[in-house]
């Protein structure tokens, strides 16, 4: 059972459907079932309430077990899962949502996302239509997308008249997604960043380490703080309890404008995850 008073208070943001979502959460991509259970329990213990999983991760059941072990009431949690590309389609997406709910042991998810637009598959608009149905039936409180470009985002909005609540995209100092953030904002869509820690590639960067030293923070904390100060929601992945606790401890300082600018100058367009224009996996 978790302590009654969590150690970290995480702010929330209001989505375009009036639901609220924590600004910072734990992702469990590429974690084994055992790693997932331990990571989720560690995160919940220190005050995290947003857990981000996906059908493609193969660990929804592990998330369910960790949540059950925590003793935290379902209503206090924000659980995200994602539609796998092979399940895209109007009816298939609804069936996939129900299958995810079965694995999660839940009646609803707080946020259901299309994992990838997968343009070569040509089903993301139909999949979005199915997700609208799932929301209408109460199986998903909010619905959104991942890895959508402006073209993909405009297509589903124009064809269904329903705007995603969230667009979760790869976003870090090497790929600051300035144009996509502006596009999301124009559509009143929250930008949620993933891979914010750059897979560890900037931890020895002299700009980052100098800024971290100035604030008495870790490079990871500075990376997360930079992302939050851009106005993004963020999910990060970690399997280590001490890193999870440290990474949620980012709400007691603010980066100065010159430090934000220095971080912004690291942008070079490096993409660490697949190109959403061509990728047909996950």
Swiss-Prot record:
It is an enzyme of class 1 (oxidoreductase). Pfam families: Aldo_ket_red. Keywords: NADP, Oxidoreductase. The active site is at 57 (proton donor). Its EC number is 1.1.1.-. The keyword Phosphoprotein does not apply. It comes from the Bacteria. PROSITE patterns: ALDOKETO_REDUCTASE_2. GO terms for molecular function: aldo-keto reductase (NADPH) activity. NADPH binds at residues 197, 235, 237-239, 246-247, 273. Belongs to the aldo/keto reductase family. This is Aldo-keto reductase ML1669. It comes from Mycobacterium leprae (strain TN).
